[in-house]
From Swiss-Prot:
Outcome recorded upon mutating residue 44 to A: In strain: 405 / Serotype 8
Name by which UniProt lists this protein: RTX-III toxin determinant D
Encoding gene (name): apxIIID
Lineage, highest ranks first: Bacteria, Pseudomonadati, Pseudomonadota, Gammaproteobacteria, Pasteurellales
GO cellular component terms, A-Z: plasma membrane
Cellular compartments annotated: Cell inner membrane
Keyword annotations from UniProtKB, A to Z: Cell inner membrane, Cell membrane, Cytolysis, Membrane, Transmembrane, Transmembrane helix, Transport
Biological function: Involved in the transport of the toxin RTX-III.
């Protein structure tokens, strides 16, 4: 190994010495300097050899190399913006308000015209919903009748508690929709039902009183035969003593014993009858209570049903009133009337048909842009964007500048672009300039938003296809 190193050292030393000697005599090796006309008189081949090479090709070569070097340096140093293009349109932050009817209706009055400024709450249209007035009146009458029935039931309950009719007042506001004949009928019905209940109760009270009288009669007979039985028993005892001393005959004793047995049997019969009368009396008392309980239970059941029907009719009336209110269309916000589509009084409008659009006053103009699926991963909130309005060429009117405000988290299906993500971009102004003239932008104008997602050097941009090709070529498929 050492010999190899020594050999290489001697080899390079020899060439260094030779180069040094040649360098010393380098000027002697040059051709003698001649003038241009001297070179012209030389033979052709010598003229070509001796004539100095022109400096222009060398200068051009140097310039090309310089430009190439500068291009490489600039491509490394300079950066280009990476943008994600998104199509969209200008919208107001509060969005334009579409005015639509909730149902089919006839146009009764039109109070605005296209381009007119309206205040919030100002009357726009007056519609007539088909059958709304009739439905409301019908429901109102039905509700009044139900309230009248409810008042009748409550009056009867009061009558049951106090055993007399209350002072009936049918001039309340709840009964304004009820006709007088209905009120009179209700008054008569209350009186009739109360009197019927009173008669039934009176009949039961009479039956109860009869049973009480019968009970008193039975009690009197019981007391009578208790006394008679006691007396006959004492007589029988005395006669037994006389019979024992042979003072009376046996027939007299047996006759007295028979009278005692008869008195005892009559007493037993009336005592048994007393139990039956007491049972009948208890039943009569229950029947008397049952008349009131059944009448009250029937009234309470009907009152409960009446309350349910009244609630349903109240909701139905509110629904009809809401239909009437919905037919009177007012401006939801202050703004300008646009796209007015109905101009004929008496014309027909259909459910959810857009009658006009209200562009809100002093609302912020924004861009609603659709970001393609391939770009959404690089777009972030706060990134800057350049907005080009298709209506006005940017080469003449310039751009709008903005920042990404929001990005939806869920994609939506677009018929041309496929799955896209909706985003909102704030813009710095809502006008474009053409010389000294300012052009007002409006909602609905189509735009192209170029969102700046980053920067990239020019050299990497140029080499990326090569890098991609190399990467794919070195991979087994």
């Amino acid at each position: 190994m050492k010999l190899w190193i020594l050999g290489l050292g001697e080899f390079f030393q020899r060439y260094r010495n030779i180069w040094r000697e040649i360098w010393k005599i380098r000027k002697q090796l040059d051709t003698p300097a001649r003038q241009k006309d001297e070179n012209e008189f030389l033979p052709r081949h010598l003229e070509l050899i001796e004539t100095p090479i022109s400096k222009k090709p060398r200068l051009i070569a140097y310039l090309i190399m310089l430009f190439l070097f500068l291009a490489i340096v600039i491509s490394i140093i300079s950066k280009v913006e990476i943008v994600a293009s998104a199509t969209g349109k200008l919208v107001f932050s509060g969005h334009s308000k579409e005015i639509k009817p909730i149902e089919n209706a006839l146009v009764k009055d039109i109070f605005v015209k296209d381009g007119q400024f309206v205040e919030k709450g100002q009357l726009l249209l007056n519609l007539t919903a088909l059958g709304c007035d009739a439905d409301k009146q019908k429901t109102k009458v039905s509700l009044g009748l139900e309230r009248l029935d409810g008042y009748r039931y409550k009056s009867l309950l009061y009558s049951i508690e106090h055993n007399r009719l209350p002072l009936l007042d049918f001039n309340q506001a709840d009964f304004d929709s009820v006709q007088e004949e209905d009120k009179t009928g209700a008054r008569h019905l209350i009186t009739e039902q109360f009197e019927t209940w009173q008669k039934q109760k009176y009949q039961k009270e009479l039956a109860y009183q009869r049973k009480q009288a019968e009970k008193q009669t039975v009690l009197a007979n019981i007391r009578k035969y208790e006394s008679a039985s006691r007396i006959e028993k004492e007589k029988l005892s005395d006669l037994k003593k006389l019979y024992d001393v042979k003072s009376i005959s046996k027939h007299e004793l047996l006759a007295q014993e028979n009278r005692y047995v008869e008195a005892s049997n009559e007493l037993s019969v009336y005592q048994s009858h007393l139990k039956e009368v007491e049972s009948d009396l208890l039943k009569a008392q229950e029947d008397l209570k049952l008349v009131t309980q059944l009448f009250k239970s029937d009234i309470l059941e009907k009152l409960q049903q009446n309350i349910q029907r009244e609630k349903q009719l109240t909701l139905e009336l509110e629904k009809n009133e809401q239909r009437q209110l919905a037919s009177i269309i007012r401006a939801p916000v202050s703004g300008t009337v646009q796209q007015l589509k109905t101009h004929t009084k008496g014309g027909v409008v259909t459910t959810a048909e857009t009658l006009m659009v209200i562009a809100p006053e002093d609302d912020v103009l924004e861009v609603s842009a659709l970001i393609q699926n391939k770009d959404v991963g690089f777009v972030e909130i706060g990134q800057e964007a350049v907005i080009k309005v298709e209506t006005f060429p940017y080469t003449r009117y310039g751009y709008l500048y903005g920042k990404v405000k929001t990005i939806t988290l869920d994609a939506i299906e677009h018929p041309q672009l496929g799955l896209v993500f909706n985003s909102i971009i704030e813009i710095n102004k809502k006008t474009l300039t053409d010389g000294d003239k300012e052009i007002q932008l409006g909602s609905g104008m189509s735009v192209i938003a170029e969102i700046k997602t980053g920067e990239r050097s020019v050299i990497s941009f140029l080499l990326s296809p090569l890098e991609e090709s190399i990467t794919e070529s070195l991979r087994e498929r």
